[in-house]
Amino acid sequence: MNNNGNALSRTALTPTNNKVISGDLVTNGLPPIDNNIICSNGFMPINVTRKNPFRKRTTQEFIREWTEWKENSPSLFTAPIVGVVTSTLLEALKKQVQSRLLLLMTNLLFPNNSTSTMEEILRATEQYVQEQLDTVTWNRVSQELEGLKNNLRTFNDQIDDFLQNRVEISPTAMIDSINTMQQVFVNRLPQFQLSDYQLLLLPLFAQGATLHLTFIRDIIINAGEWNIPEAQLNTCKRYLKQYVAQYSNYALSTYEGAFRARFYPRATLENMLQFKTFMTLNVLDLVSIWSLLKYMNLYISTSANLYNIGDNKVNEGEYSISYWPFFNSYIQTKSNYVLSGVSGYAIRWYYLNTFFGEYIQDNLYNIIASYVGGVNGPKIGVQLSTTELDKQIKQQARAGMPTGLDDLSFNCTLRNPTTVPYFACNFQELTSSGTAGTGGFIRSDVFRSEDNICGLGTGYASAWTSYPDYYITNISATVQVDGINIDITPLCFGEDRAITSTHGVNKVIAVYNRKANIAGTNQNGTMIHQAPNDGTGFTVSPLHLASFTHPSEAHIQENYGNSGDSLRLTGPTTAITYMLSGDGRTIYKLVLRVSGVITRITAKVRGNSIGYLEYINTVDNNQGITDNGSKFQDFEFRPTITIDAQTPIVLEFSATSNFDLMNLIFIPYYDTPIY
């Protein structure tokens, strides 16, 4: 018998198996009933493997992928166009020539000269936040969308006319068109910032701001072809920096204020994670791109995380909002390693009710994620060993309450964690009397890769949660509340701090990230970053390090608009190593995005210094953006570097106060940032 959650036949008070390798999909006698449909069982997303992350992709591909995702994800409140826009922007930034990004964005957001797609974003937000615009405001916003659409069409038509008949349109006429469109954006965007509806309108604002920023960027990139005078070009460069900061600060402060307002003083972690995921897809992903629009040939390799969390309601509990910073870092434990599997200790208990008959209750006592290199994450749930748990279960069984039990423990291992990762999961609690009996509940905590389905209750996994271009990079969980105070002092980066509960695991959590350019792993299991082979620049998350000298002096600092969180360093000196792999042909410049006051940064490649930066102070010298307290600036090392196979990049820091390492950016040596 396979006891990984598929077989419901029971044994008389004796577990049939203490550890089962579960990977097959088997049906069983009790019909699975899906109470939380997220994806149809037959839907297989395109991005199920990490293969060829640098291939060129078309907008049509993104439209197809996100449309199929939405068709198979009816319970999610996100319009597919927001994913299409983000994916298209990321693809456009990879290309050396994307001359008219505004035209592409206009056609996506106003297809067939209609505002219906933008209105769909607003309706989806209304559904999620459970608020609605009043009729007057809705009509006002609709009119603003109509006006914006018409002005964008007029401007794009004027550019077409100029390019086709350049002798008939003077540079003065071009400048007049640009100034008119600029004034439209300045006047229209405040209509998506109405004081009573700031959160509700924020996704629309994010799309409008993206249109404005790509408009300015197009002018700068095409200044020569469009005969833009140098004075006007310099004005546009100033505008791009100004509005990136202005729009970023508004979006970030609105998100932060809404998060605190919704979840103060206490809330469930499920609600917090769902809000973070919704806002990342609809707003924060775009914000993270805005400050990188100044680079013209860049592959953004990481993203903020998305999440899926179980819908279990037993002993759910609420947490103080002060718990969130700890929890945000906890679910990213081992984020610099490559996930290789997950295991858990689970028991299915059978009980008999005199009036309603037999019912089932599943208990997941603990769960542990595993990573390449033989590395394990912290044990979440009951901290007893397997032997001790077996003894406890037998004692409980002999007490006479249950009529039987099955051991549903699982031990899942990916065949090839680097290229064939988990891409989807199914977390649900089945409470139908026809499935679990009256008063019963059955768990389904299942993970899916291209060639494997594994976890607790695989026979009930009729629904899957996935996101185009995202992979499951970590697995965590919440515990059932039992009165034990959880230690929420800041986690050191990579710290294995157990989360204890005598009642076991409540909700399993899957963490999704876009990270795809993984060349392999180091001997310790940490990831090696693959550089593009076509001369494109790329980014590296500061959290994806290979090693560092003072782990107790590093923490995860949450950032909302930074393609992921930062590494906060608190010691006077530290050295961090990142391992990269490339073909050795592209010459790069290294740019560091940092926040704080730093005495000195020295960069070494293959053990040789390539230069240093001294006396950095982003309190005074920054890009004008405040991201959860971080004011940042990009600093470039002048010497160039090449990246061969297994190239270590070592960063040595000296500082007298805390500072944040927010991003590593490798740009082709011939590219100059816009500002």
UniProtKB/Swiss-Prot annotation:
GO terms for molecular function: signaling receptor binding; toxin activity. InterPro entries: Galactose-bd-like_sf, Pest_crys, Pest_crys_dom-III, Pest_crys_dom_I, Pest_crys_N_sf, Pest_cryst_cen_dom_Cry2A/18, Pest_cryst_cen_dom_sf. This is Parasporal crystal protein Cry18Ba. Pfam families: Endotoxin_C, Endotoxin_mid, Endotoxin_N. Binds to the brush border membrane vesicles of scarab larvae and damages the gut wall somehow to allow the vegetative cells of P.popilliae to enter the hemolymph. One of its GO terms (biological process) is symbiont-mediated killing of host cell. Keywords: Sporulation, Toxin, Virulence. Belongs to the delta endotoxin family. It comes from the Bacteria. SUPFAM superfamilies: delta-Endotoxin (insectocide), middle domain, delta-Endotoxin (insectocide), N-terminal domain, Galactose-binding domain-like. PANTHER family: ENDOTOXIN_N DOMAIN-CONTAINING PROTEIN-RELATED, PESTICIDAL CRYSTAL PROTEIN N-TERMINAL DOMAIN-CONTAINING PROTEIN. Transmembrane segments: none annotated.
